[in-house]
Amino acid sequence: MPEVAGRNDLLRRRARASSTETPSSEIRPLETQPYVYPPRRDFVEPDWRRLPGFRDVTEAEWLSAKWQRLHSVKNLDQLQKVFGDLIPADLVESITRDQLERATMSMLVPPQMLNTMNETDLWGDPIRHYMIPAFADRHPEWPSHPHSERDSLHEADMWAVEGLTHRYPTKVLAELLATCPQYCGHCTRMDLVGNNVPQVIKHRFELKQKDRYEAIIDYLKATPSVRDVVVSGGDMANLPIAHLEDFVGRVIEIDNIRDIRLATKGLMGLPQHFLQDDVLAGMERLAKKALAHDVDLAIHIHVNHANSLTPLVATAVKKLLSMGFRDIRNQGVLMRGVNDTPEALLDLSFTLLDHTKVMPYYFYMCDMIPNAEHWRLAVHEAQDLQHSIMGYLPGFATPRIVCDVPFVGKRWVHQVESYDRALGISYWTKNYRTGIEHDDPDALERRYPYYDPIYTLPPGGQEHWRAGLPASAHA
């Protein structure tokens, strides 16, 4: 084995030379990598008193969920009072116009989220960019895709009973309410969630809440093929803990239910809610009940940028994990101007893992709702990002970028069946029928389209759409 021995001797000589001739502080081999760990942002709670509107707020007030809700920003006047002269006049003007002409969600931002914005660059701040969109943020020619829809995933079409979407064979989505402690500009349920805005008169549940919950429970009991329930809305953080505990507790008792996921952005946007004694007590009772019934009970949160994560969020997460929840996972949304770089996705994923003990899980491509084109990425851009983040995180914590294809469901972005890059149309297939296709013989043979933002297409593709040429709805 002389060749191997010679190679080993050479490696030892190089190691000795490095240790004797080069100071260790100058050896930085990892800095040649496209991404360098750890993230450069300090994990701290920003001082809210730096903002003019919060200058006199005490720590006790800041930690109060009631105070946070009462002082959430609901309009431009309140936003200006928080930031004072720090918010540029042209940004105020642009947000005002957007609220009148483009916004699909009303403004609602808790102080906790406002405090994570960069007050020295509000135009460029990623959290402001998706929570409080400005007219100038939107694409001037294509604010909406021609195929955008209010309920782009057709969730209401798949309601087995009001508020219960049965899209996958073994999984359902229970929309318990239509409000949140914060309203995201890109909300995929903009058709149902939140207050009316000039552009959108929201649909409303017709059944009383109690009757709706009873109908959902009855359906789950009568449908043994369902084993997995996502409890969402809206946001469960807006449901009184007694109501949440009653509903989820009853779902836990159903024999065929093995997995329950509680979905909330509030754990990031309003962690104070989950640090209240009554909420913690109710959540602990649910965790213990789930364990006793051999049901996996997990929490899914929605964080899009590392700046949103603070020690207060980590405290709330760790308290919940200590109670016996199966896991707390993050499902972010991939958005241009927010997290559309490998660095942004990796910074967020590492901060989730290292500081909050939240598992990076999914990044969804932004759905094709009206006036969302400036946030959306093309499928090939998402594929490139997925490639770029591989190899840095543990395999079990590497988030998957997925496309939620209408009438199909989640698909990893590399699962596309065919892709016309020139026209920006990708085609996808599926191996199951949704709740509205049980008698459709062609459902498993059909190819389902998804559309790239038109401004990402080559000139010829853009001209195709400008000319109004018909794009096939189904291939």
Where would I find each of the regions flagged by the language model?
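Short cysteine/histidine-rich metal-coordination sites, predominantly Zn2+-binding motifs
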Residues: V200-K208
